[in-house]
Structure formats: structure tokens, C-alpha cells
Amino acid sequence: MQIRRIDAGLALFIGLIVLAMARYGAEAFASGPWTMADDARQFLAWGARIGNPSAMPHDLLADYWQQAAPPLYRALLYGANALGIGPVGIASLLAFPLIGASALLTWRLAGCFALDRSRKLFAAICVMAAILHNDSIFSGTPRAFASPLILMMMLGMATRRHGLTLAGLLLSSLIYPAPAITCLGIFALHLMDWRWPWTLRWRSVAMLALAGVTVVASGLFFKAGLADWGPTLLLQEARNVPSLATFDGRSSIVGRSGDVAWLCSARIGFLPAIVNCQGNGDPRLILNALLSVLPIIALWITGRRRHDQNPNAATAWPLLPYSLISSLICYSLAALVAFTFHLPARYSQPVLLVMGSLAFGLLTGGWWSRGMDRLARSRPMARMAIITIAALIGIAAFATPKMRLVRPASSDLVALIASTPHGTRVAGIDDDLAIIPARTGRTVLATPEHDIPYHRRYHRDHQALLRSSMAMGELQQPVLTAEVRRQNIDLLIFDRHFLESGVLPASYSAALPPPHRIAPSFDRIAPLRAASCRVIETPQWVAIFTSCLKRPAP
């Protein structure tokens, strides 16, 4: 009986993936009852409507974020609901199949570039480590699908399976269109016969036209659905929006100097933020370049495709420079019209994250293979020590994925709101309010987390609601009663420190232009109690039920 040998490299790779999944599972499902992904607080703000279409009436957050959810993402949420899995549940579970699919596609894609086991293993490990240290795949949002779909499209091109590439382009255009456009550019370069004279076969033209129509039509359809919330913000206008134009703003596009961070920032920077950086002068951008763009250029210059007798090498290796070229072109065009077609960074960063880390892994894998061969002959003990150190680094990288999970500071507050009737409308000033719509299905008037500035009508209306929440925090009659009735608020929630000091929490200050404080108003709670208002106080927060304010005057 023939015994099949176990591929030690594959076993190690699988072990690291399982380690990352286990760590995520522990954090997402065993660290508290209200834990969820950071960005999912936005995209699931309308989640109560999935099971009950009439839920959350006259809710600005639900109206906008329902429309902002791409078609395939909405279909996924409705499908999960039909199986009895709620929106937060499916968003939390998504990471498992997406990590598994990414790992499988990464291993196969790495094999298209290298037959040498060390280079293949290093390439696969570097790609997955980069994906796991970019929080997208854990986000539970459309962005979570970016890396596996990019890998799917690249594998299709590397193996000449154009049906796989077209399927990836279609799926990406329906759930996260920006990387699909960049990958469409890569596909166009891939189909081109670069031998002189340059030619493009009619079959390739037809295939590219089909892909182009699919991607562009899907993107325009999605953009048209958001037209009622526009027009979109212009770059010169963004400089006057606090959340964009301040370094610590929620959607910041500037560095510490105040200049637009074109090179390195999460939303407008060209380089993938494998290591967090923000600003054109941030020294960490050099590290990001070393981990992504520079390895692509190095392999492009040295022509490493000759190093392997790999049947897919001639097709696969050009994808590295094609990725850089297409990313640069698409990013530049998006930057010229920022933010008309989404964030410029979304056109370059997801693709360069995958292909740049792949190139880095191929380079380091080659160095490793040659170095280990020499040490095996001359210094076996040193070789073992280096292998041990490398293994520990790999374990540390996969044991510490960047998950960006959030938990409320006051679980008792979330539990209180969750116990109220389903139609309850909540307003106030407290950071924990950001989790309420997605986690409890109750309407919240406005929160800094949902203050997304790219569509001007939505941002204008949301800013007004944030100001209304701030005005209610003054607890000053008759303004309080008038605002409660105008906004039809059932429950007011305030950070106790805000009422005692009058100073807005930092997240609210970053979202709103000045003023950022009110007169301390904690002493005005006593008259509300005297008016038979139900008030609950804790050292962290104050809850005021407003039925006493909504009763008609005698």
C-alpha cells in the first residue's frame, strides 16, 4: 500500500489559518454578548427591516445605509434571515468562510508563481498575513469580500481560466465595485498580446467588452441608487468637513501637517496600510512600500519568471506589474474626481495588498531557500535557530489578526435599550449609541460613527440631527420638550460626564464643527424627576424616558 507523504508546508499553512480562525472565534463569540465588527455598525443600521420591512420608520440612518448596501450584500442578509440567522450573526460568521476561501485561493495562486516549496509557502503566508492584518475580512461588510474575490480573479488569469475571472468580476461588481474596476484593467492588460506588433484577438475583445459592460453597469446602477442622497462631496469641500479635514477625524484624509495624505491613509492613500500610517511624511509609509509596491517593481525588473519551470509562470508573472499599473491608473482617475466614484484608496489598496504581499513572499521565499541550503551544509545549528525564530514570528502574526471588534463600554445600557419596545426612538450623546441600531433594532437619531460625509444631503441632515441631540443634552425647557416632540424621541441617553462637564465626547467633537460644549446640565435632571419623568442614573450614563414630556399640557 502506497503511503502518501504529508506536505509539511501545506500542513503549517493550514495550522496557521486555523490559529487565526480560532483567535477570531474567541474574540467575536466569547468576549461579550454585544460584540460586533466596527464597520458593521454602519452597514447593519437598517438590519431590523430585514425581518420586518415596516421597522424603523422615518429613520435617516436606516434609510441611507439600506440604500448603501450593494445588491449582493443585501441578498446575503435576506438569505441568512430566511435560515434564521440575524444580520449581526451572519456578519460575524462571514469571516470563517472568507478566510478559508482566501487561504485556498492563495495557496493555489502561489503555486502558479513558484514550484519551489519554500517560495510557495512564503508567498502564501505573506498574502494571508497581510489580509489578516488588514481588518477588511473581519468587517462583516461588503469590503470583507474584496480579498477573496481579487484572489479569485487573479487565479483565473494566472491559470487562463477566464470563466473564473469573469465570475469574480461579476461578483465583485455586485458587492464591492471599486476593486472590480482595477481588476478589469488588469484583465485588459492580461488579454493583450504584447509581442510586436501589438494585437488583441476578437475573442479577447468580446470577453473584455462583456466584462467591462458587467462591471461598469453594476457600478453605475449602484451609484444611481444613492443619487437621492447626493450630490457627492468634492475634494475642496472635504477640507471644510471636520471628520475629513482633521487628523483624528473618523474619516480623516489628511496627515498631521493638514495636507491630503495621498501616499498613505486608509481612505485616500495609494499604498495599502499593511502597517497603519497616515500622511505623506509618515515614516511608516516606507515600510508599507517595502511590503507591497517595491517587491513588485523588484520582480518586474529582475524578471523572476525564468526561475521556475512552471507551466503557469509565463501567464502568472506579468500579473504583478499589471496590478501595479492598473492600480496606479485607476487610483489616479478616482483621485481626480474624488469622491464621485467612491474613495480613491479602494481602487489601489485592496489589489496591492494581495499582489504586493505575494511579491514580497516570493522574494523572501527565494532568499530563504538559498540561505537555508547554505546553512544546512555549513551551520546546521544556526539553521535550526533561524527556522525556530521564523516559526515563532509566523505564529505571532497569525495569532494577532487585526479584527477591529467593538464592545459597548456599558453593556447594561445596551441591555436596557434592547428591553424597550421595538419602535423605540433613541437620541442623546453617548458613544455606545453607535451599536444600538444594528444590535437592538431600535432607531437612534444620530451618532458620530454614522456621520459619513461623502453624500452631501445625508451628511447635512445627519449633522442637523447631531446638533439636535446636543441641544437636548442641555435639558433646558422649553427647548427640550420641543425637540423631543419634533423628533418623536422616546428615550434620551447621555454620557454622564457630558452632562456634568458640558464637554462633548471626543468622537462627537471630531464629527462636529465648534462649539464642542454646552453649559453643564446635570442639575436639570431633578426637575425632570419632579415632572414624573422616569430617570435611570449610573456612574457612566443617564437614561431619561420622555413620555412625561410628550403628554399634552393640562
Segment roles from a protein language model:
Residues 307-337, 359, 388:
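Transmembrane alpha-helix segments characteristic
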Residues 396-554:
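Extracytoplasmic
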